[in-house]
Amino acid sequence: MYVYTGEGGGKTTAALGLALRSVGHGHKVVIVQFMKGRKDIGEWKIARRLAPQYEIHQFGREGFVDLKNPSEEDKQLAKKGLEFAREVAFRKPNLLILDELNLAVAVGLLKLEEVMKLLDEIPKEVVVVVTGRYAPKELIDRADFANEVKDVKHPFKKGIPAKEGIQF
C-alpha cells in the first residue's frame, strides 16, 4: 500500500502519475474519489479516452465539504464510496486509488475502523494508494511506502489561482 499525505499540494497528482504509468503498461486502474464531485477536472475528463483500463468514480458534492461540520449528505456519500471501493476491489484492478480517504477519516466522514476493515478485505494482488492530509498512524504503519508532501513554495500563496490542466 502507498500513502500520500501531508499539508502540501500534489498528493492526488502523485497518485495520478502512478495511474498513468499503470495504464501505460496495460493495467486496470480504478480511482475512487472521496469528497470530490467536480466533473471539470482532468482526471475525470480523460476517463473516456483511457477506458476500459482507467475508471474514476466520485463520492462527493460539487462544492466544498465544511471540514469542521460536514453535512449528513457528505457522510452518506463517503459511506457509499467506501462500499463501492469494497465492491470494486473484488474485480481485482491492478491499482486502486482511494483519493482523499485520509481526510474523509480525519473530518469524521468515515471511521478509521471501517477503513482498516476494508483494507483487510482487499485482495493482496491489488495495489492500493491512499491520499489525503492527516493520514492516521495506523495507515502509515500498514503502508509499504508513505510520503509526506510539504510545500516549499506554492503559487496559491501568491494569490495565483489554480490552473486548468495543472492543479485540476
What are these regions (language model features)?
Residues T131:
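Conserved D-loop beta-strand region of ABC ATPase nucleotide-binding domains
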Residues M35-R38, E62-F64, N102-L103, Y134-K137, ...:
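Conserved nucleotide-binding/hydrolysis micro-motifs of P-loop NTPases
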Residues R21, I46, L118, E138-L139:
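Hydrophobic/aromatic ligand-binding patch that stacks against planar heteroaromatic rings
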Residues G17-L18, W44-A47, S71, L110-E114, ...:
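Short, glycine/charged-enriched secondary-structure capping and boundary segments
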Residues Y2-E87:
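Conserved P-loop
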Residues A135-F168:
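Phosphate-binding/switch region of NTP-binding enzymes
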Residues M1-V3, K28, N94-L95, V127:
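Residue-level preference for the first positions of well-ordered beta-strands
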Residues D66-V127:
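Phosphate-binding/switch loop-helix module in NTP-utilizing enzymes
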